[in-house]
Amino acid sequence: MADIHNLFMSFNDSITLSDAKTNSLRTSRNSLRKEIKEWFGDNGKQKPKFCWQGSFAMKTTVNPVGGSEYDIDDGVYLSGYSEMDSSDWPATTTVHNWVKNAVDGQTKADSINKDTCIRVVYASGYHIDLPIYIEQNDSIYLAHKSKGWVISDPKAFRDWFIQKVKDNDEQLRRLVKYLKAWKDYKAVSLKGIEITILASNNFCVYEGHDEKSLRDTVQSIIDSLENSFICYKPVAPYENLFEGFSKTKKENILNSLKSLKRALDNAINEEDPLTASNYMINEFGSRFPKGEALDQAEAKTAYARTNAPGVLKHDGRSA
């Protein structure tokens, strides 16, 4: 059987954000934080606090496919409201306008006032989402533009996933990234948070073999969804993220997962690394590296064996 673990490790490198992109994101984030603090101060309001959250904080962000944008979440936590009755909190539409006014003009594109955040779009191919929160009595409330203040705890989800990685293995983080890259390339109707939960709850460690860990994890996800097509958020408000999915959507997701599982089986059972990698390229795209044809690999092995220094006997001659 071909050993394609090293190909998966190279794939992980190719889908991971570069240091340059990471630094650019941090610079943009810090600039927005500065503008928001200044706007709040200039308008007689307590300066908010911030929390890096989402896939960037969990180190599971992947480079997007084609011209798609990648994004980060930076939570804006309003100060001065924790001791108030929630009925006295400002309207969610009001706090959205505050943050939008603070960041307008920071980029050429207008910021977008979405239901759950203010989105700032950058010409470099990424955007920063700014969800707004109030924390009270160990609960965190999100400013949803149409639903009002709703319970949502992104920090708890981040901590949940980080603990999952600690309890299991760093391999889990890589598998989440592989599956995110897969769903982007194959246009599978799953969100990043859903993939993160499914992979974490069904993770099968296989030390030194990401391809086998991924195969077993995908099979476990399939078994779980065929038993009950649910994906509960592990932190408040503990909702089923698959609520309302149509039968067709569920079938499409399961069929895509089964196709991935078959490709992994074929790749793992294949003797030729090049053929094995082609199965994976069909699922992950051209960012997955090509393996070396078996005859070339064997020739290199034979050459290395032939040109290896001989074992010396006690008299100094080659054995």
Summary of predicted features, one role per range:
Residues 73:
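Glycine- and aspartate-rich repeat motifs characteristic of hemolysin/RTX-like Ca2+-binding segments
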Residues 23-27, 89-93, 166-170, 189:
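Soluble non-cytosolic domains of exported or imported proteins
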Residues 27, 31-35, 94-102, 174, ...:
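Long, highly charged amphipathic alpha-helices
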Residues 1-69, 80-90:
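N-terminal regions immediately upstream of nucleotidyltransferase
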Residues 19, 23, 36-39, 44, ...:
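Conserved catalytic core of two-metal-ion nucleotidyltransferases
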Residues 100, 113-235, 312-319:
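Catalytic cores of NTP-dependent nucleotidyl/adenyl transfer enzymes across multiple folds
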Residues 76-80, 203:
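Short beta-strand-to-loop capping motifs
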